[in-house]
């Protein structure tokens, strides 16, 4: 009994800790977390004794990065060969799974680049220019067509997923880490450099995700952009090495040790392949119905009955949705493992003339579609090349900014969190670039 109580206390403590990180994320996003430094120290203690794949000698980092890029390229070629030989998609069995994943990682994507925000005040020091340029490129240099956060928001909006799902608190860990690092760069500069080093090395899952989203009719421009801009030859991955070389004191083992701790922060939370694999189609459909159930009670005529119970009675009790799905099948409203359009229930929820038009979101309808379809394989969605949706947008480049050096502190504040994706933040980014002279040159 004592052991059971102890386990219960520990379990509750873990729940409290994860609940806390979701609130912390929101506080950091608003710039109001007075205990972020202490929290970040706690996260660093969590990873301090973990293993990593960095070389003991920082002089070997260029070779390490080259080896990493070569391994990713090799593994991606192997993946493509498997697909050509008929292997199924590795990550996304259904489109619903892809939509679920995009919503699960939204808290991190909403603060893309935030860990580098604190470098902006060092614009007079050329050693910081690599980190600053990386941050500005994450912000699209203030161009709404190129701002990474806006690109992701547009993707979610196009897919009907902007409202978002109730998320496990652990989904906020990486976003909170990034925001905390960005707000406390002065104290945690080595850790910022290390985190940046790890985050900017293009992983295999990025390439596979880009490939499979396109197959499922989803514009993977956001992911393709990170494949190209983070490249190890001349992109953010290469720049992360140069920034470390320029900012690290000579032969300072403690500094490099802290860099490695920052690098390990990337491993907090669930890794991408494991997150994707945790998707449960029926579980997500049941969860969606349970959320809807509360609002659907007493909204149906008592003439609507399934296995002797009215729809209102089915919706009145928590935990009854699995039985509800079974009843829909038994009475012929749903034909599993078949074209969803052959199910009478589908005609109730899909199309402008449907009796339940608008009841289910685009994501929820995709859950229904893929659950009904089951093993049935239709033609599938038309492939969307990365950037196809973005190219069709009526967005234009904004005018170059104008600002004085005396205004830079105000501009930096307007670029914090994800405020840089708002019109005022986009303008502040352009003004910051104009005031500091940190333009990115191009061909003439």
Positions of predicted regions on the chain:
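Non-heme di-metal
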Residues: 1-444
């Amino acid at each position: 009994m004592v052991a059971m109580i102890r386990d219960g206390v520990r379990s509750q403590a873990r729940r409290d800790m994860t609940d806390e990180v979701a609130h912390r994320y929101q506080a950091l996003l608003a710039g109001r977390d007075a205990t972020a430094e202490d929290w970040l120290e706690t996260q660093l203690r969590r990873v301090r004794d973990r293993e990593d794949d960095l070389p003991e000698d920082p002089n070997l980092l260029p070779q390490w990065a080259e080896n990493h890029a070569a391994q990713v390229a090799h593994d991606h070629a192997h993946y493509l060969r498997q697909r050509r030989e008929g292997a199924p998609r590795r990550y996304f069995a259904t489109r619903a799974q892809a939509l679920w994943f995009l919503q699960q990682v939204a808290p991190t994507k909403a603060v893309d680049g935030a860990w580098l925000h604190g470098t902006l005040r060092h614009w007079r020091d050329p050693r910081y220019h690599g980190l600053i340029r990386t941050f500005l490129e994450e912000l699209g240099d203030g161009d709404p067509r190129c701002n990474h956060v806006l690109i992701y928001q547009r993707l979610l909006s196009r897919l009907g997923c902007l409202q978002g799902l109730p998320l496990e608190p652990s989904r906020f860990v990486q976003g909170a880490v990034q925001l905390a690092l960005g707000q406390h760069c002065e104290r945690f500069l080595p850790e910022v450099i290390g985190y940046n080093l790890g985050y900017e090395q293009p992983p295999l899952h990025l390439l596979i995700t880009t490939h499979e989203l396109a197959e499922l009719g989803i514009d993977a421009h956001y992911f393709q952009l990170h494949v190209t801009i983070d490249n190890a030859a001349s992109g953010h991955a290469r720049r992360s090495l140069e920034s470390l070389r320029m900012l690290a004191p000579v032969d300072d083992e403690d500094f490099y040790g802290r860099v490695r701790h920052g690098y390990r922060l990337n491993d907090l939370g669930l890794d991408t392949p494991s997150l994707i694999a945790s998707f449960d189609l029926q579980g997500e459909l049941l969860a969606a119905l349970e959320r809807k159930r509360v609002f659907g009670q007493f909204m149906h005529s008592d003439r609507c009955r399934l296995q002797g119970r009215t729809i209102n009675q089915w919706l009145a009790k928590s935990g009854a949705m699995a039985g509800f799905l079974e009843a829909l099948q038994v009475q012929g409203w749903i034909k599993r493992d078949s074209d969803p359009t052959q199910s009478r229930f589908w005609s109730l929820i899909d199309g402008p003339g449907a009796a339940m038009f608008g009841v289910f979101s685009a994501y929820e309808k995709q859950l229904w579609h893929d659950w009904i379809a089951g093993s049935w394989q239709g033609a599938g969605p038309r492939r969307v090349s990365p950037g196809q949706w973005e190219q069709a947008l009526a967005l234009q480049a904004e005018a170059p900014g104008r600002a004085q050096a005396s205004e830079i502190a105000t501009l930096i504040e307007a670029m914090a969190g994800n405020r840089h994706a708002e019109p005022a933040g986009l303008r502040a980014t352009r003004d910051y670039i104009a005031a500091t002279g940190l333009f990115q040159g191009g061909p003439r």
